[in-house]
């Protein structure tokens, strides 16, 4: 099938005006899937092979994020891991040297909350795998549904986003998020860390608010009872214990090895979530946090981190200042709250993350703090800072070569490495740009 098939061609396939015959639904489905498949193949980027030789980037300005800036620096990586970094590094004799003089080297950006890999086309339900059936799905591991062929992955890479914390949605307990690398052949290869957080959607304050909060309490109570029964069996105090995959998945939460990320924006939601988490004795992360500045002192005192979503947007309420959302990161920073900046959850808008951080830098947050909010801060909050988020010896060679600060609009991401693999920089946006630039060139020649 020609990947340039037009809408009119598609309609004529569905409906033949001569025979007045409408194609059966299952044939329509097959045709749509075929078009999506061939279109995707035309835009597919081949995943990079594992790093096979030592690579040394020389002459660039290295922004480590955690240990300052190194002018005329050298960074060496082998088998996907940084082995040397500094201004006076003795290069291995067999290293492939890449001169990046005049360029800048940054750690790959991290989007701490989005639906990339589980959302493709909003109008095509079969390409959306965000929500599971039913309200309680703690056992849903998002990486199992991750689509490594998503065209949004290449767009994310081109924007400097090399790690995506893909997050399920819907229901009361949505499932578990996962940190995914933006290159690889399959979900197993792309998973940096599974189970970065258990996702809870705090009930919306409405007529059923108290009832829904109680449902959440009861759910955690059932899961805790399950763990107690299992522990009793392990100690030999009980002979029978029926396994439940939902409650089994929540055991790491009670053992303190998995945080709970609560989607809460309004001040009442945040306050009640804080009280609930303290009662449950669990590690809490606030997601969304539109009103988090109103309880910033409490968040700071309790060391509760916040992942802010959609900084680059309008205020929540008509009476709020026009820059209420732009200035929110700066307010949290001044209050001493640990926070990260995430963009829109929509996979189609994931490339806006650098602009979200850039907007905060224009409204009260320093550029260094804004950069940290999309690198080391989300890495630390989600427990992946031993691998990504900064440029240090022993961490993954997941980095950017750029023309400037990646949160600046004018900056170009010239090349990326993910665990030492030199990734393809083509994406669907660039393909369309080249296509329509050719149209302009043809018009000029005419």
Give, region by region, the residue ranges found by the protein language model.
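Sec-dependent N-terminal signal peptides
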Residues: 26-35
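Boundary at the C-terminal end of the N-terminal hydrophobic targeting segment
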Residues: 42-44
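Histidine-rich, glycine-flanked metal-binding segment
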Residues: 47-49, 53, 62, 66-106
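C-terminal cap of metal-dependent C-N hydrolases
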Residues: 60-63, 392-436
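His/Asp/Glu-enriched, well-ordered alpha-helical/loop segment
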Residues: 121-122, 127-131, 139, 259, ...
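Polyanionic/metal-chelating signatures
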Residues: 152, 157-285, 412, 418
């Amino acid at each position: 099938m020609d990947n340039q098939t037009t809408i009119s061609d598609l309609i004529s396939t569905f409906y033949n005006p001569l025979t007045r015959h409408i194609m059966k639904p299952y044939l329509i489905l097959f045709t749509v899937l075929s078009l999506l498949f061939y279109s995707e193949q035309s835009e597919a980027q081949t995943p990079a092979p594992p790093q096979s030789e030592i690579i040394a980037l020389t002459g660039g300005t290295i922004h480590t994020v955690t240990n300052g800036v190194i002018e005329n620096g050298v960074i060496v990586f082998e088998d996907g891991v940084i082995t040397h970094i500094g201004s006076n590094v003795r290069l291995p004799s067999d290293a492939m040297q890449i001169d990046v003089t005049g360029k800048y080297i940054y750690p790959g950006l991290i989007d701490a909350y989005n639906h990339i890999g589980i959302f493709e086309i909003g109008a095509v339900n079969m390409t959306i795998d965000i929500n599971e059936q039913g309200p309680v799905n703690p056992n849903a591991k998002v990486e199992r549904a991750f689509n490594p062929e998503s065209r949004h992955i290449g767009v994310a890479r081109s924007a400097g986003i090399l790690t995506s914390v893909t997050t399920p949605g819907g229901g009361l307990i949505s499932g578990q998020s996962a940190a995914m690398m933006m290159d690889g052949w399959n979900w197993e290869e792309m998973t940096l860390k599974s189970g970065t957080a258990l996702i809870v959607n705090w009930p919306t304050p409405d007529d059923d608010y108290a009832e829904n909060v109680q449902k959440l309490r009861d759910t955690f109570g059932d899961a805790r009872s399950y763990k107690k029964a299992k522990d009793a069996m392990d100690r030999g105090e009980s002979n029978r214990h029926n396994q439940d995959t939902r409650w089994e998945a929540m055991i790491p939460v009670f053992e303190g090895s998995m945080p709970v990320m609560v989607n809460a924006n309004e001040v009442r939601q945040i306050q009640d979530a804080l009280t609930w988490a303290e009662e449950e004795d669990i590690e809490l992360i606030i997601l969304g946090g539109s009103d988090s500045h109103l309880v910033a002192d409490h968040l700071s005192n309790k060391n509760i981190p916040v992942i802010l979503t959609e900084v680059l947007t309008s205020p929540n309420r008509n009476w709020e200042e026009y820059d209420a959302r732009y200035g929110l990161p700066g307010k949290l920073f001044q209050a001493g709250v640990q926070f990260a900046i995430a963009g829109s959850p929509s996979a189609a808008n994931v490339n806006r993350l650098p602009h979200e951080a850039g907007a905060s830098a224009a409204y009260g947050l320093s550029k260094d703090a804004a950069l940290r909010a999309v690198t080391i801060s989300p890495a630390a909050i989600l427990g992946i800072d031993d691998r990504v988020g900064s440029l240090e010896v022993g961490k993954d060679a997941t980095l950017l070569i750029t023309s400037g600060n990646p949160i600046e609009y004018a900056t170009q991401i010239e090349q990326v490495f993910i665990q030492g693999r030199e990734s393809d920089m083509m994406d669907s946006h660039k393909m369309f740009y080249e296509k329509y630039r050719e149209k302009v060139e043809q018009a000029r020649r005419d």
